[in-house]
């Protein structure tokens, strides 16, 4: 979409118009994967909201996302309750996880979205690899955009360090968490 050293504009992406896009939670997913023993546990958050402000120059665009940590869902009520506790998210005292972008830059046909991720009142910088999926119209005639994004983080960086030691020096839960997003957002009038 952009050559090195040039600016990506909405005019270089067919159908994309500058404006504010609201994340459509019914057609989007925010999820994570973490190692548990020899397998991986996958989870999602059921309640979230977000806004993407697309500027004429893509590099000036911004995004903000807010996630209700109590809405974590891993297909196990017992595990979900533990994740909401002070051992992990402490959702009662720190109910939201937020992401605020600080920069977006093209990388080949994709993008890198840099921003500040806050969990349990700890804010750290992360970079998300973003694949822009395109522009279309939904059933209501609204302009919609779609993308997939992902990053890997160390949960310990946010003070989420609960674990159970196992024989041989192993731990029950991995430190690395893969975050993945599938997002559809609609242009607001």
Locate the predicted segments by residue:
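Low-complexity, acidic/polar, glycine-enriched regions of mature
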Residues: 1-189
């Amino acid at each position: 979409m952009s050559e090195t050293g040039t600016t990506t504009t909405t005019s270089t992406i067919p159908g994309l118009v500058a404006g504010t896009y609201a994340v459509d939670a019914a057609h989007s997913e925010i999820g994570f994967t973490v190692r548990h023993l020899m397998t991986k546990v996958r989870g999602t958050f059921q309640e979230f909201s977000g806004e993407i402000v697309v500027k004429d120059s893509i590099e000036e665009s911004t995004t903000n996302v807010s996630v209700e940590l109590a809405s974590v869902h891993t297909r196990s009520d017992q595990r979900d309750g533990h994740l909401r506790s002070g051992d992990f998210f402490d959702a009662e005292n720190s109910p939201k996880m937020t992401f605020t972008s600080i920069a977006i830059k093209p990388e080949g046909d994709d993008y890198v979205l840099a921003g500040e991720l806050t969990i349990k009142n700890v804010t750290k910088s992360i970079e998300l690899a973003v694949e822009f999926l395109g522009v279309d119209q939904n059933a209501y005639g609204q302009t919609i955009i779609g993308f997939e994004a992902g990053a890997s983080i160390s949960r310990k960086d946010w003070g989420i360090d609960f674990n159970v030691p196992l024989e041989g020096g192993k731990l029950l839960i991995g430190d690395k968490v893969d975050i993945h997003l599938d997002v559809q957002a609609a242009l607001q009038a």
